[in-house]
Structure formats: C-alpha cells, structure tokens
From Swiss-Prot, chain B:
Entries under InterPro entries matching the protein: G-protein_beta_WD-40_rep, WD40/YVTN_repeat-like_dom_sf, WD40_repeat_dom_sf, WD40_rpt
GO cellular component, one term: nucleus
Post-translational modification (record): Poly-ADP-ribosylated by PARP1. Ubiquitinated by UBR5, promoting disassembly of the mitotic checkpoint complex from the APC/C complex.
Cross-link (Glycyl lysine isopeptide (Lys-Gly) (interchain with G-Cter in ubiquitin)): K216
Name of the protein described by the UniProt record: Mitotic checkpoint protein BUB3
Originating organism: Pongo abelii (Sumatran orangutan)
Classification lineage: Eukaryota, Metazoa, Chordata, Craniata, Vertebrata
UniProt keyword Zinc, yes or no: no
PTM sites of type Phosphoserine: S211
Main location per the UniProt record: nucleus
Residue positions where N6-acetyllysine is found in the record: K179
Coiled coil (residue ranges): none
Quaternary structure (record): Interacts with BUB1 and BUBR1. The BUB1/BUB3 complex interacts with MAD1L1. Interacts with ZNF207/BuGZ; leading to promote stability and kinetochore loading of BUB3.
Pfam families: WD40 (PF00400)
Keyword list, A-Z: Acetylation, ADP-ribosylation, Cell cycle, Cell division, Centromere, Chromosome, Chromosome partition, Isopeptide bond, Kinetochore, Meiosis, Mitosis, Nucleus, Phosphoprotein, Repeat, Ubl conjugation, WD repeat
C-alpha cells in the first residue's frame, strides 16, 4: 500500500471482490485462482497472459477469467494486483467500503459475538478448511477452494447457501451489490454472523451499500422477494424490518424482505464442512488463530463456551505450582467436558468426553487392576526380589484393597491420585518421607517412592 | 493382505499397542510398548521377539536412550529403564499419575517424561536419576524433542516450548491452532517447527520462531476423513513420524490409513492401503528405509469387537517418501 490515493483501501481483487492484507498476497491469489490454467495448472500473470497460454500451448480458447464474479470476467483486461483496475470500478469499490464502514460502526454496537471465524481470509495462510478433497494433497494456502470457486453471493461459503434462492434474482441485475457482501470474507462474516445473531439491522446494511449507487436496481429486488417470504421466521422479521426500515434505510420494505431470507437457516450450516466444529465454536474459533499471531499468552481464555473443561482447567491452572495431590485429584473428579460435535453431515469418531483416548481406555476396569495404590510399593516383576513375595499376583488385589489404610475408591488412575495424600509426610507414620519426588534409586532393592521400605520387606498384608 | 514389501510382526502384544520406536542407530530393532503391560523388543528382519519385560500396568510409551537401553512408562506411574543386553531392570522413578510420554533428547542427554499428573520430569540417564520436575498447565498428552528444546502438548490444547538447558521458565506458551484436542506433536528435524495433530482429522504445521514473518507460514490441513453415505467421518490423527532424510512425515489416523506428507510443497505423497484398525503409532527407522505401523484399536467407539491388533513393518521407497520436485 505504498500508493497515494489511487488505492486508499486494502488491496482487493477485481475479479472476485475479495479483500487482502497485502498486495503480494493479492497477486498470489490472482495467480492461483484467476490466472491458473485449468489444463496444466500453470500460473500466469494476467488474464490476457492466461488466454494466450491456453491458445498457444493447449490450442484452447477461454473467454472468461476463471472464478470471477459475473461482470468481472473480462479476459482481455490486463489487471495485475491492483494495477489495471478500471477507475469506475475503483470508485464503486471505495463507495462500497465507505458504506460498509458506516455499517460496521452501527453493527459494532450490536454484534459482540464472533468476529472470528476459522475461514480466515486470503491473507491468512494458516489453515485451509477446504470442504473438498481430503484425500488429495492439501491445498496451498493461497487457494481457498471453499470460497472463490463460487462467484458472488453463492460464493459465500458455508453460511450463505440459504442466501442463494433469494439472491440470485438480484445478482444479474446488480453485480456491484454483491460486492457488498463477499468482499473480504471478514466483513462478510460479520454480516453473516450477525444474521444469525440478531440482525435486522445488518441485513439492511448489506443492502445499503448498493442502494444509493444503484437505484435502478431496486426494482429488480422484488422478484427476489417471494422466495424468501415463505421461509420460517421471515414474516416476523419482515414486519419488524418494515417498521424499522424506514428509519434505517429510507428504502421500500422490498429489500428487507429479501435479506432476512438467509437469516434463519444461516445459523446452522454456517460452516458445514469447514470443520463442523466451527458451527459450534464460532467464538473460540478465530481466537485460536488471532492470538497465535499476537499474544499466545493471552489465548488461554478464548475457548469458553464450547470447552468448559478448558476454562476450568485454565482457571485452576493459574493456581498450580507443583504437582501436588490436590490438583490432580480435582481434575480427575471433575466431569470432563464433552466435545461439541458436528453437524448432520459429519461425525467425529471419538468419544464425547474431551479426554484423550488413552485416558478413557485407562478407566476401563480391566486396566485398573494391580495398579499402584497409595503407599504401595512399586510392583516390579519377579526380578525385584522380595517384593515378588509381597505383591501377590492379581488375585491378591481385592484383598489389598481392603488392607490399605488410605483406601480411596477406584479412581481414574487406579486411585493413585486420591491416594496421594496418603503418602505425603505424615500419612506413613513410620517413614514420613518428605519429598514426594522420587529419590534416585538403582532399582534392585525395592525402594518404593514413598520410602515405605520396611513395610515392603515385612509383608504384603499391608496393602 | 500385505505386499511383499510389508509383513506383520510375529508374537505381537496381547492387547493394544501404545507406541513403537526404532533403535536410534539401526533399523533392526524395534521397541514396542503395549496395553498388555509388556514392553517388547523385536528383531525386525528376523521377525522375532528378542526380549520382553513387564510393568504392572499398561505401558503407554517407550523410548530408546541408546541402542542398549529402553525406557518405558505407563499406567502404573513407574518409569523403568531396561538394559537390553543384560535384561536388567531398573525402576528409575515415578510420577503421581500415569506416564504418557517418554522421550530422549540426545543434544542435552536427558530423558523426559510427561504425565497426566501435569508435570514433565527430566532424568539423567547415566545415573539414572531425576533431574527436575516441571509443572505444566494441564495433563501432558504428547512430547517431542527438537534440538535442545522440548515441545509439550497438553490437554486444553496448550503447547509449551521449554529450553532443556534452562528449565527455569517456559520459553514459549502457545495454543494449538487447531480447535480440537491435541493428539500428537512431532518436531521437524530442522528444528524450525513442529507438526501437531488433533482428534478432528486435522494437522497443523507450526513454526517455533515467534516473529510474524515466520508465523505467517503456518498452515493446517484436513486429513484422515472418510465420506460414507454423505456423512463425513472424522478421525483422530494419532501418530506422526518424520522421515529422517527427506523431512517428510507420515500420519496415522483412527481411520486405519497412513499418509505421507511433504510439508514444504504441501502435498500428500502417498497413502498406503487401509490397515485393519486404527493406527496407534508410527515410527520410521533412522535410515528411512522402514516404517513400523502399529494398527491397534483405540477404543474410539468403546469396548467393541475389533480386528486384531498388530504391528506391520513396511519397507518404504523413495517414491513414497521423497518429495517431488517443487511446483511453482
């Protein structure tokens, strides 16, 4: 963004109206999405360049720029990054953005939830939630298959399919209107989410930008209305909007009807394939990425709603100093959070609780036997001499349970945790060994961590 | 079921396999830890079990300190060192909860263990004795050594990077860029970063250098997902192993597939045939010629009938593991 006025805004792609942080990234995007040969995947530099390549190398003609929105498919316009964009389109864009900023200010007060979404823009190379081809290679950062392939409104990934029925009638008539939505998925996301959230205001906002600039288009909208109308939830909204519309838009209620259309359905399929999880975790989702780039240290809080276990562990984490009895016991006894899974189209093959597979398996009764009990000597195998005598094999276990003084109930880890207090100093009167930390030992002589040496020697009845 | 380049090990453990590790200097020996409480050493070319020793609870991880010493830990909270030549056992220490990971750091010559007691303990392998206990914010699920650093993956999707030469403070506190529970972390051999996998069929490639230019390069991708009847089944990615020479890595998931990925060109190089059940652990031999694949049901869907657990040894070729020339 070294230019003066000409750009003024963040770099954006003329072909699909997406926003980018950086012109370099914009160019990479264009090369990968618009100037890439569909036959040999060679990336060219410009539209005409691509056309010439296809003609010369593959003897094929192309007449439209791939992945471009209608109206922006001109293969002959030489556009590279931000250069070559016709002035009038630049102006339109600027206007759009101005209106959008007005919108987002209004919105800011209303929309407090998720500004983040996993499908984080072109600029972010962090993560490809592509809905496609899991089996193929994975797609390089610049290609965001989920998004660009669809021009215009339908192109709005997951959240927008519902929008389509109501929107297409609008599109042909007003390509510039669409830009109000898709450009910079970020923005769009905000709108989308606010659709879900609340907003009657928002949708209006969506329509707003084109308004002033495209009065002739308005008439085009009514045709779009009927489809949305039947949708559940629309009628109420329509009315509400009709009420507020005049105040907001000084537009006929017509636009309002269309906009609400997407709202009800949007909530669910917001990110169907982009990790169904995201549908549930809209809030925390983005915060995973954002904090990573800024302050990792602050990222402990974000996953609040969906992963309560994390919250409680982060809370308790702050009080953790060293491994002590109290903490592990607390974590164990607290109920693990459950995973918020998926949508109807996907299924996470994992138990519901958010504990690791090994922890879950360890809880099975068959793995709980002959685990060390507090105060119990570590059971070695036969080579560990004397202990062999003390620790009768499996059958002896039930009896041990009865014996041991601090006999905690079967815990997750074989009761070891609950037993911890058992071998803190004082619990083992004869031996009050101070440090819970294991003193070095050379194996051989059975030296239980808790210094219960003599008992080990004496007999097994103790445990 | 397997081709001539692959065979199944004889005398496998009698229950699930938790970890497989090749000897550091030869592809001949493989150490295997199991839920049947045993740790076994196999002579791979001869396809026979050389040695076996026991814990009193399921063993969750094992590692070689050097070609003759195996370390292991598990549900019995005990960290054992076993001399493979003399068959002598040594109880080195314990944690307060099951030990989940055991790793060796050659640069600093220290063994590291991570446990569900939310600590990482370091051990001097020569004595052997405890060389410190370090609190983690959560239960430790995975550990990986990168040069002289230790990368710890815990519950709650936290990732901590410790400098093994200076354990007074955590060098980096991070959060996994994946939204689901961390399953496995393995460091790149070039020490620039690590690969992290989650239970939700996704793998992230992250860099250690915190500067923004480097952080921009990080990315994640979906994998180990199968579409059946319009429902996408998403599987945990349990295992990651790097190929020493090509810097490519293999991932194994609960879908029973093993994929080999080229992280620099961001491409998948290869996918093997489907194994009978979930892949619990993977290990490339140090010369990159052999991949040990532990196919072992991980109780993702509770205690149910499942195919037999087994360890498959596969001779891998360059075609499967070597990056193709980079595209533009």
């Amino acid at each position: 963004m070294g230019r003066k006025k000409k750009k003024q805004l963040k770099p954006w792609c003329w072909y699909c109206n997406r926003d980018f942080d950086d012109e370099k990234i914009l160019i990479q995007h264009q090369k990968a999405k618009h100037f890439k040969c569909h036959i040999c995947h060679k990336k060219l530099y410009t539209g005409p360049g691509l056309a010439i390549h296809c003609m010369q190398v593959h003897k094929e003609t192309i007449d439209a720029v791939p992945n471009a929105i209608p109206g922006r498919t001109d293969i002959e316009l030489e556009i590279y990054g931000m250069e070559g964009i016709p002035e009038k389109d630049m102006d339109e864009r600027r206007r759009l953005l101005e209106q959008k900023t007005q919108e987002s200010q209004k919105k800011k007060q209303q929309d407090d939830s998720d500004e983040y979404d996993d499908d984080d823009s072109a600029a972010s190379t962090s993560f490809q939630p592509q809905p496609v081809q899991p089996q193929q290679g994975y797609i390089p950062p610049m290609a965001q298959p989920g998004l660009p392939p669809v021009p215009g409104a339908p192109g709005m990934p997951p959240g927008i399919p519902p929008l389509m029925p109501g929107v297409p009638p609008l599109m042909p008539g007003m390509p510039p209107v669409m830009p109000g939505m898709p450009p910079g998925l970020h923005h769009q996301r905000k709108y989308t989410q606010s659709f879900c959230g609340e907003n009657i205001m928002m949708p209006m906002g969506g329509m707003m930008p084109p308004g002033p600039g495209i009065p002739p288009l308005m008439p085009g909208m009514p045709p779009g209305m009927p489809p949305p109308v039947p949708r559940p939830g629309i009628p109420p909204m329509t009315q509400a909007q009709a009420v507020s519309a005049p105040g907001i838009l000084n537009r006929p209620p017509a636009p309002t009807a269309t906009v609400p259309a997407p709202q009800p359905p949007v909530t669910k399929p917001l990110f169907p394939s982009a990790g169904q999880a995201q549908a549930a975790v809209q809030g925390p989702v983005g915060t995973d990425f954002k904090p990573l780039n800024s302050t990792p240290a602050t990222s402990t809080e974000p996953p609040k709603p969906t992963f309560p276990a994390y919250t409680q562990s982060t809370a308790s984490t702050t009080s953790t100093t060293n491994s002590t009895a109290a903490k592990p016991a607390a974590s164990i006894t607290s109920k693990p959070a459950t995973l918020t899974t998926t949508s109807a189209t996907s299924k996470l093959i994992h138990p519901d609780e958010d504990i690791s597979l090994e922890e879950r398996r360890a809880q099975l009764p068959k793995y709980q036997r002959n685990l060390p009990r507090p105060g119990q000597a570590p059971i070695g195998n036969p080579p560990v001499g004397p202990i062999g005598g003390m620790m009768p094999p499996q059958p002896g276990i039930p009896q041990q349970q009865g014996m041991r003084p601090p006999m905690p109930p079967h815990g997750q880890y074989g009761g070891h945790h609950q037993g911890m207090p058992g071998y803190l100093p004082g619990a083992m009167p004869p031996y009050g060994q101070g440090p819970p930390m294991v003193p070095p030992y050379q194996g051989g002589p059975p030296r239980p961590p808790m210094g219960m040496r003599p008992p080990v020697m004496s007999q097994g009845g103790r445990y | 079921m397997t081709g001539s380049n692959e065979f199944k090990l004889n005398q496998p453990p009698e229950d699930g396999i938790s970890s497989v590790k090749f000897s550091p200097n030869t592809s001949q020996f493989l150490l295997v830890s199991s839920w049947d409480t045993s740790v076994r050493l196999y002579d791979v070319p001869a396809n026979s079990m050389r040695l076996k020793y026991q814990h009193t609870g399921a063993v969750l991880d094992c590692a070689f300190y050097d070609p003759t010493h195996a370390w292991s830990g598990g549900l019995d909270h005990q960290l054992k060192m076993h001399d493979l030549n003399t068959d002598q056992e040594n109880l080195v220490g314990t944690h307060d909860a099951p030990i989940r990971c055991v790793e060796y750091c050659p640069e600093v010559n220290v063994m590291a263990t991570g446990s569900w007691d939310q600590t990482v303990k370091l051990w001097d392998p020569r004595t052997p004795c405890n060389a410190g206990t370090f609190s983690q914010p959560e239960k430790v699920y995975t550990l990986s050594v990168s040069g002289d650093r230790l990368i710890v993956g815990t519950a709650g999707r936290r990732v901590l990077v410790w400098d093994l030469r200076n354990m007074g403070y955590v060098q980096q506190r991070r959060e996994s860029s994946l939204k689901y529970q961390t399953r496995c972390i393995r460091a790149f051999l070039n020490k620039q970063g690590y690969v992290l996998s989650s239970i939700e069929g996704r793998v992230a490639v992250e860099y250690l250098d915190p500067s923004p230019e480097v952080q921009k390069k990080k990315y994640a991708f979906k994998c180990h997902r199968l579409k059946e009847n319009n429902i996408e089944q998403i599987y945990p990615v349990n295992a990651i192993s790097f190929h020493n020479i090509h810097n490519t890595f293999a991932t194994g998931g609960s879908d029973g597939f093993v994929n080999i990925w080229d992280p620099f060109n961001k491409k998948r190089l290869c996918q093997f045939h489907r194994y009978p059940t979930s892949i619990a652990s993977l290990a490339f031999s140090n010369d990159g010629t052999t991949l040990a694949i532990a196919s072992s049901y991980m109780y993702e869907m509770d205690d149910t009938e499942h195919p037999e657990d087994g360890i498959f040894i596969r001779q891998v070729t360059d075609a499967e593991t070597k990056p193709k020339s980079p595209c533009t």
